[in-house]
UniProtKB/Swiss-Prot annotation:
Major subcellular location class: membrane
Gene that encodes the chain: atpG
Membrane disposition: Peripheral membrane protein
Keyword Cell membrane on entry: yes
The protein's name in its UniProt record: ATP synthase gamma chain
Keywords for the protein's UniProt record, in alphabetical order: ATP synthesis, Cell inner membrane, Cell membrane, CF(1), Hydrogen ion transport, Ion transport, Membrane, Transport
Length: 287
């Protein structure tokens, strides 16, 4: 059994770690509230944009935009949204596992994949496991802006425009609630039609002013940008929630470990006192 002094040292070490994890839990909770507000503020715009685009995909358009056309799939692209920091449980690895399974399915069909990475964890992961990374951006912090995301988005849209990509997806974590975050892979291009059964029964016609080509070119790029930005802010809210839960679990585990060490310490101290008493009694008997 370890000595009492050594056990006291372990208890002090765990207590120090517990203070750190508790502080990180509180910081994550504060950041989560802010990121939830940012997510809630942008979600109506992203959802409305998705609905309008769904109508367009079902509409009788004067100008058929290339983003509406299905192609024979030879290469697909993924915009992968991850975190810049760790200590957020299995948030990133669960997302990467989902993506790898998807990529394996395409590979079995002879389809190649390109990756545009957002966040240092994705860059580190695919730097280790391999993958055709064509763009990446890291270090966006807790308040990402659309201007920081333009680089990877522009690279993937250009590849799609030039016919080098036949499908484009965004891979991110969807914020369900504080305890639940769900990895999701959402198709961006070609535009998926509206999923609502009632909408599919309707025929959507639009009048364009001044020119349908200019209007649709702008609208469809805004659509992609809005979905990517929404994916990033939802992933950020998921990150802070996952970190808060992970740090709370670490703090609770630290408390349990301290109780166990305290019990071991008491036993060690009791054994030491018993040993001393035995030695005193033995010495007195010898005299």
């Amino acid at each position: 059994m370890a000595g009492a002094k050594e056990i006291r040292s372990k208890i002090a070490s765990v207590q120090n770690t517990q203070k750190i994890t508790k502080a990180m839990e509180m910081v994550a909770a504060s950041k989560m509230r802010k990121s939830q507000e940012r997510m809630a503020a942008s979600r109506p715009y992203a959802e409305t944009m998705r609905k309008v685009i769904g109508h367009l995909a079902l509409g009788n358009l004067e100008y058929k935009h290339p983003y509406l056309d299905e192609r024979d799939v030879k290469r697909v692209g993924y915009l992968v949204v991850s975190t810049d920091r760790g200590l957020c449980g299995g948030l990133n690895i669960n997302l990467f596992k989902r993506l790898l399974a998807e990529m394996k399915g395409w590979s079995e069909k002879g389809v190649e994949t390109d990756l545009a990475l957002i966040g240092s964890k994705a860059a580190s992961f695919f730097g280790s496991v391999g993958g055709n990374v064509v763009a990446q951006v890291t270090g966006m912090g807790d308040n990402p802006s659309l201007s920081e995301l333009i680089g990877p988005v522009k690279v993937m849209l250009q590849a799609y425009d030039e016919g080098r990509l036949d499908k484009l997806y965004i891979v991110s974590n969807k914020f369900i609630n504080t305890m639940s975050q769900e990895p999701q892979i959402v198709q961006l291009l070609p535009l998926p039609p509206a999923e609502d059964g009632e909408l599919k029964k309707k025929s959507w016609d639009y009048l364009y002013e001044p020119d349908p080509k200019v209007l649709l070119d702008t609208l469809l790029r805004r659509y992609v940008e809005s979905q990517v930005y929404q994916g990033v802010v939802e992933n950020l809210a998921s990150e802070q929630a996952a970190r808060m839960v992970a740090m709370k679990a670490a703090t609770d585990n630290g408390g349990s470990l301290i109780k166990e060490l305290q019990l071991v310490y008491n036993k060690a101290r009791q054994a030491s006192i018993t040993q001393e008493l035995t030695e005193i009694v033995s010495g007195a008997s010898a005299v």
